[in-house]
Every structure is written in C-alpha cells, then in structure tokens.
Design a protein with these regions (language model features):
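Short, hydrophobic/amphipathic alpha-helical patches that form generic packing surfaces
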Residues: 29-36, 102-113, 340-349
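Basic, short loop/linker segments at the boundary and entry of helix-turn-helix/winged-helix-like folds
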Residues: 59-112
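Short, basic interhelical loop/turn and adjoining N-cap
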Residues: 93-98, 115, 125-143
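Structural motif
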Residues: 92-101, 196-197, 329-338
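Helix-centered, glycine/charged polyanion-binding patches within enzymatic domains
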Residues: 252-253, 257-320
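Polybasic low-complexity intrinsically disordered regions
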Residues: 95-96, 104, 112, 122, ...
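Long, low-complexity, compositionally biased intrinsically disordered regions
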Residues: 1-63
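Basic, amphipathic alpha-helical segments enriched in Lys/Arg and hydrophobic/aromatic residues
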Residues: 297-365
C-alpha cells in the first residue's frame, strides 16, 4: 500500500514527505500539484486559479455488455456462415475425407474455446445439434488437419474475409509483430559459459491492424529470427486491396526507403520515426520529404504516430483472450493455430462493432 502525503493548497508550498522536510524546497509532489493547478495574480491583486482536467473517454457499457453476453452464440453463427461456403476437394478413391468446412469450423472453434481436443468434444456436439455443422469431427482428425500446409492459404483468406465488414470504418492502420510461445525447445553448448543452454522457441506473427476497432487486415507468420522490416510491403499491399488506406504507422524497425515507397504506392502516408543517425540525403526525394517533416513538425508527427500504440492493444487482446502460446508441436500446425487465433480475434471485433456501430457481417450465408 502506498504512502499518503499532505500538501498545502495553491496559496503556499509545503509537503509532509521526507524530501521536503529535509531540503525545504519543492519536491516532486509540489511540482505535480503546480503542473495540475496554477495560480495567477494580476496587478490589481485578483487571483485566478486554473486546474488541469484530465480528459476521459466514456465506455458504451450497455452495448458492450450485450455483445459479451451473446458473443459465443454469434461467434458460432458467423463462423458457420463462413465455413459452410468452403468446398471439399473432389472425392476420387479411398475412404471419404471429412467435410472441409466442418473441419475448419472445428479448428477455429477449438482455438476460440481454448480447450483440449477431448474437452472440446462437447462443444462440437452442441454445434451439430444446432445444425452449424453437418458432421462432428473427431479431435484426432482435427489435429491432422492442423498439420496440412494447403490449409494455410485458406486460413489467411479467412483472416481477410473476417476483416471486410469494417472496411468502411478503418482508414488508419498500424503494423508490428508479436511472438507466440511453443512447447519446443532448442539447446546448444555455450563455450562462454561452459554449459548447455536451452530456450523456448516461438512463432512470430506480423500484423496490420486498424487503429479504431483493432481488426487484423493482414497477417504473415514467420520464424522468430525473421526481420520485421521486409514484411511491410506485402502486408500493406494485401490490406490496400480491400481498404482505403490513409495512414500507416510503424516503429523504427520498419524504417526503409522501400517501405516508405510501398506505403505511398497505396495512397497512404507513412508515419515511421527516423533514427538518431538518419540523414536527409542519399535516399531520394520521398525520404528527404519525410525526414524534414519528422524533424520540423515533430509534434504533429507524434500525434499521428501515437496511433501505432493500438496494435499493442491488438496483440494483448489476442493473447489474453486466446492464449499467448500454441499447443501444436509441428511448424505447420503452429502456423495454422496462430492464424486461427487471428480469425477468432477478428470475429470478436466484428461482433463488438455489430452492437456498437450497427454494422452488418456480409460474409454470413
């Protein structure tokens, strides 16, 4: 529990903290009060006291509570509306495979529930009873499909599809990457420390997200050692195919001439801060223009760049709701599991905006 100090009013300077008692000069508490409450005395002796009021933003608790209460039900219906349009591969010979749409439904819904395969069996039975799927998929079959490489492009398309209901809402975007832990470890012998060292491996996800609703509009999964900078052009281009992009914010790791050009090519303005050793010359007119804007209009630049912090909220939303690690053991299964987390997150954002903004989910069958 923190300590409480008694401060005088604006008419005098005093504080009961040990720092003020010892030095008899302004302590941090007095400075804090003066920054919040200022006193001005004019020539006639009139005193004007100005108090700084912190701006607060109200929460639409009514619609938020409603969306939370019906989230699971609407999630299942929205997901079924997407997966029911997935066609199974043509049957040729051998034992018929499980319906692909039902299998993808079970994969995404299992990640949403964060249960093990066996405990998730009850949810699949309920989904079949509500006619959201045609066949209940055994959990071992579902795990086998997580390992299929040909499902990865389909899941990426589902990420894009689930973001489309918000294409009229989002115009400013941010890009960043985040890691998801795995159960795999790597070991090596360190000659410096004279012992074997082990560390947990993780999967890196590169996101483009809208700064208003935190919807993910572009995603790419790579290994933990891949750099962030080269991934921006592809993700921005994919987002621009469905969204009217006005701004793209990113941290210094994405600073390069190629990235600035890629953002300009889609009609957006880049807000990427320059490094301390960056120079204005040598990289073309676009680089020079953005460098001078950053240096001469830094306050205005930071007002736009601050939107980048919303992608940190996106990362937190995904990890806190659907887990910050993956259960799968193989690389392909880990990639597909992370993509399922992103699909779950997008559907959650769509459900939230259905109640707060009144949008419609056009991908429902």
């Amino acid at each position: 529990m923190g300590l409480i100090w008694s401060l005088a009013t604006v008419s005098g300077q005093s504080c009961t903290c040990p720092d003020y008692e010892q030095r008899k000069s302004k302590c941090k508490h007095v400075w804090a009060v003066e920054l919040t409450v200022t006193k001005e005395v004019d020539v006639e002796g009139n005193i004007t006291i100005t108090k700084t009021v912190r701006k607060t933003y109200s929460q639409d608790w009514h619609n938020y509570n409603i969306s939370q209460q019906v989230e699971k039900e609407q999630f299942m219906k929205l997901l079924s509306g997407i997966t029911s349009n997935i066609r199974s591969p043509a049957y040729s010979f051998g034992r018929p495979s499980a319906p692909l749409g039902d299998t993808v439904f079970s994969m995404v819904f299992k990640v949403y529930r964060t249960f093990s395969g066996r405990r998730f069996n009850t949810d699949m039975t309920a989904a079949q009873q509500h006619e959201l799927i045609t066949k209940r998929i055994p959990y071992n079959t579902m795990f086998d499909y997580f390992k299929k490489k040909d499902l990865t492009p389909l899941l990426v398309q589902m990420v894009t599809l689930t973001s489309l209901p918000l294409r009229t809402v989002e115009h400013d975007f941010a890009i960043d990457s985040t890691g998801f832990g795995t159960t795999n470890f790597q070991r090596w012998y360190s000659f410096k420390h004279g012992k074997e060292i082990s560390s947990r491996r993780w999967v890196k996800a590169h996101f483009v997200t809208g700064v208003k609703s935190n919807i993910v509009t572009g995603v790419k999964i790579t290994s933990e050692f891949d750099n962030d900078c080269p991934e921006l052009p592809e993700l921005v281009k994919a987002t621009a195919e469905n969204f009217d992009m006005a701004e793209v914010s990113a941290d210094k790791a994405y600073l390069s001439m190629d990235n600035l050009q890629a953002i300009q090519d889609v009609g957006a303005k880049a807000f990427i801060p320059f490094k301390s050793n960056s120079q204005s010359s040598g990289n073309g007119m676009l680089w020079k223009k953005m460098y001078h804007y950053f240096m001469l209009n830094n306050e205005e630049f930071l007002q736009h760049y601050h939107k980048r912090s919303n992608i940190e909220a996106t990362n937190h939303m995904i990890k806190s709701k659907f887990g910050d690690c993956v259960r799968s053991k193989t690389w392909t299964a880990q990639v597909n599991e992370v993509l399922c987390k992103v699909i779950c997150h997008n559907l959650y954002c769509v459900i939230m905006e259905m109640h707060t903004l009144g949008i419609e989910a056009e991908f429902v069958s």
